[in-house]
Design a protein with these regions (language model features):
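ATP-dependent carboxylate-amine ligase
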Residues: 1-105
Length: 105
């Protein structure tokens, strides 16, 4: 979950380059929409823009508009030896979301 529209816009190229370089052949990245903490942000970028850029580099990248749909979307990609790493910034609900996801797995 990217953090903030301004930082995502500013760091877009770096995010795409670094994430693409880190992903191995069978790795996947799933991303939900940018976390909006309020204020007067210009919402002219989406996490889907990052996903499309990463896909263009030949990587397995997926956008989930509503993170509550994430588990249903990702289930078919998970196996017994999968590693699922959830990351986000400044979203106070992320911890609870992770706990709920773990319980459902």
């Amino acid at each position: 979950q990217p953090h903030g529209y301004g930082p995502t816009r500013f760091l877009r190229k770096d995010f795409v380059e670094e994430i693409s370089a880190a992903l191995r052949e069978n790795d996947e990245i799933w991303m939900s929409e940018i976390f909006y903490a309020g204020g007067t942000a210009v919402k002219d970028i989406s996490a889907n823009d990052l996903i499309e850029d990463i896909k263009a580099k030949g990587k397995k990248a997926y956008f989930v508009e509503d993170r509550n749909d994430f588990l249903n979307e990702v289930k078919s990609s998970l196996s017994n030896n999968s590693v699922l790493l959830l990351m986000g910034a400044r979203d106070p609900s992320l911890e609870e979301f992770c706990k709920e996801l773990y319980e459902k797995l």
